[in-house]
A protein has these predicted regions:
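A domain-level signal for the structural core that forms small-molecule/cofactor-binding pockets
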Residues: 1-233
Length: 233
């Protein structure tokens, strides 16, 4: 973390076991050369995977490039958070502000580490900085934290905790952090029970947001307009 007058740059928010699907890759961040080598290896492996499923991908014009497409999608998009260097996050003094900072409806696209199916939904984040020595961050930086952890393989509970810990680490000397994710899972709609439209809600809270019934937690959920068991924006 570098400091420049009243600004601080944060570039280390990793809080997950290295190498796990929901953690950074062992060699992260990868160079362009390393990514190219990984794509080549993954392309070969996925071709063998299709062979095992008796898919004649080599002669099917719609599937002949599928192994490479899938490999590139994982490295460059779906799991990009495992391989890319995290963008610096700038934090600033709270300067006496002691209210809640809330960002709602942050788009989320992630992947379940169980079946490698898409998780799609929104993230709501709230935090309260200490008015004496707390830090606040630029609004878009919350989005960057979510992209960093979301572009990996994770179950929603793990992802909620990772985002919470990332925000908690960057917003130093905070009085509390709360993260709620509302998302649908393709592993529910496309396999098994095959039910579409079911949404999962997870919340991780610390500090003043920790206990039900307190003012800070109530204000956060009131801002999300929770009614009839669902979150309506």
């Amino acid at each position: 973390m570098a400091e420049n007058n009243r600004r601080k740059l944060h570039n280390d928010i990793e809080c997950v076991q290295t190498g796990f699907a929901n953690g950074a890759a062992a060699d992260a961040p990868l160079t362009d050369k390393q990514k190219a080598e990984m794509i080549n290896k993954a392309e070969k492996a996925f071709g063998e995977f299709l062979d095992a499923l008796q898919c004649d991908w080599k002669n099917d014009p719609n599937s002949s490039d599928t192994p490479r497409r899938v490999a590139k999608a994982y490295v460059n998009d779906l799991w990009a958070g495992r391989y890319n260097e995290f963008t610096d996050i700038t934090s600033f003094p709270a300067d006496g502000y002691d209210g809640i900072v809330i960002e709602r409806n942050i788009p989320l696209t992630s992947m379940c580490s169980h079946h490698h199916q898409t998780i799609r939904g929104v993230v709501h984040v709230g935090y309260i900085s200490s008015p004496e020595n707390g830090r606040v961050i630029g609004l878009s930086k919350l989005n960057r934290i979510i992209e960093h952890f979301g572009r990996r393989g994770a179950i929603q509970e793990q992802l909620t905790s990772a985002i919470h810990q990332g925000v908690d680490k960057v917003c130093e000397n905070n009085l509390g952090v709360i993260v709620t994710i509302v998302a649908t899972h393709n592993c529910v709609s496309c396999r098994g029970i095959k039910h579409s439209g079911a949404a999962m809600v997870t919340t991780k809270a610390s500090g003043v947001f920790r206990h039900n019934g307190n003012d800070a937690r109530q204000e956060f959920f009131d801002s999300l307009k929770i009614n009839n068991g669902g979150i309506h924006i």
